[in-house]
């Protein structure tokens, strides 16, 4: 496998882990580990939960007054099961914490660790060469820090791959967000049409009742006629 493709795959795997989320991968890996190893603690936890649930159901059906002996026995069984379950959960949490430490170490070794080793081992080698005079005075930057002049170093190639993947990620997110917004807005909806169709209570009130000045004029005219 060429150095160019190797560096790209390492950067791609690193970004893929970042996109999915390391905590999500940890949960998947831990559940797979429990299934493959048939962990006795997990099996005991499932059976104990089922037993406690059955005892609680039976306890609710039992009267404490009419069947006190049976009720007390079920109550002691539920309390004992809950105490054992709490202890078991603590042991499982400790085991999961240990698994998480090992898993994170493996992920770091497969991504950042491998990237550092390749950058150090192939630091003086060229990933590929640029056409002569193509980049002008910036040619030295592409070979930074120790690659031959006129070539692209491992560090610069890794940086370029990461930037391209980040740009693609942003483009996909913007496209997905635009499609989501288009689905949420109803077809043919226009804020101006909705505002124009809404009746104005002030205009209705002004058209339905005379103004105070008009009322005063009418009252004065009627009093003059009487006199």
From Swiss-Prot:
Cystine bridges: none
Question: Coiled-coil stretches, from where to where?
Answer: 72-96
Q: Where is this region: Disordered?
A: 184-227
The answer to keyword Endoplasmic reticulum applying to this record is yes
Q: Which Pfam families match?
A: CHD5 (PF04420)
State the family it belongs to.
Answer: Belongs to the WRB/GET1 family.
Name of the protein: Protein GET1
Q: Which lineage do the record's taxonomy fields give for this organism?
A: Eukaryota, Fungi, Dikarya, Basidiomycota, Agaricomycotina
The gene name reads GET1
């Amino acid at each position: 496998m060429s150095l160019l493709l190797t560096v790209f795959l390492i950067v791609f795997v690193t970004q893929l882990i970042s996109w999915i989320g390391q905590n999500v991968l940890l949960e998947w890996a831990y559940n797979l580990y429990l299934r493959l190893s048939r962990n006795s603690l997990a099996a005991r936890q499932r059976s104990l939960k089922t037993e406690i649930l059955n005892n609680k159901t039976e306890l609710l059906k039992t009267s404490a007054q009419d069947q006190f002996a049976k009720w007390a026995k079920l109550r002691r069984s539920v309390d004992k099961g809950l105490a054992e379950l709490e202890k078991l959960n603590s042991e499982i949490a400790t085991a999961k914490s240990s698994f998480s430490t090992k898993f994170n170490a493996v992920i770091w070794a497969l991504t950042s660790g491998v990237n550092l080793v390749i950058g150090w081992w192939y630091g003086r080698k060229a990933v590929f060469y640029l056409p002569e005079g193509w980049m002008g005075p910036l040619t030295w930057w592409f070979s930074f820090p120790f690659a031959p002049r006129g070539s692209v170093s491992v560090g610069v190639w890794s940086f370029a791959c990461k930037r391209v993947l980040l740009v693609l990620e942003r483009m996909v997110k913007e496209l997905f967000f635009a499609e989501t917004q288009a689905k949420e807005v109803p077809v043919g909806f226009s804020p101006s049409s909705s505002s124009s169709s809404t009746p104005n209570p002030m205009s209705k009130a002004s058209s339905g009742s005379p103004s105070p000045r008009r009322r005063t004029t009418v009252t004065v005219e009627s009093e003059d006629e009487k006199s």
